[in-house]
Amino acid sequence: MSRPRISYVDPATLSDAAMLAELERCRQEGTPRPESQAIRAHVPAIFWSFANSWRDVFKNGVADHAIKELCRVYVSRSVKCEYCGNQRSVKAGREGLVEEDYRDLLNFETSTRLSERQKAALAYAEAITWDLPADDKLWQRLHRHFSEPELVEIGYFIALTMGQQRWLRTLDIEHHQVMGGTSASMAPGFETEEALKRSKAEAGYWAGSAAKARDEAAE
């Protein structure tokens, strides 16, 4: 696998017990897994800024976690962040999200699986990610399904994950490179380094050249 554009901080060189505990949590729970945090660990304040925001806004918060998870992976599929897009939230899975739900993301409006509430949140993610007009029709739709605190949290989260994913995709980071040995939060077919390589080599891989050609043809 390629080397990242910015080096990982080796956990063995860290003396901060709290940072080590957070990296171990990433190893055991995922989303995020350790690699992205091992990059942020170059600046401890950034490491903790992300960890705390992710805990408070994504893992917890006032809006449904599964809806935020769909928005997260919608962003991954849109900006082609493979590192983020090949992870799945374990908590969202416990709340009923299944792999088939992710497959409809880029065509969410015509999905027969996703609810109207989920589609409204994804329309919000679409507008933010692609700089689309946020007209009265969109906002009426959003207010029909969400409270104002939920809209603040979902919008803030989409902006947070979009910025991080646009950055991370430039770094060439990959799973199973830092504190490996677990499959925590990996998407099906990406649980080990060997499985990841096989899945990324498949013709139907979501971020592969064939998928890119399909997306461009659909535009």
Predicted features by range, described:
Residues 117-157:
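Acidic/histidine-rich alpha-helical segments that form the ligand environment
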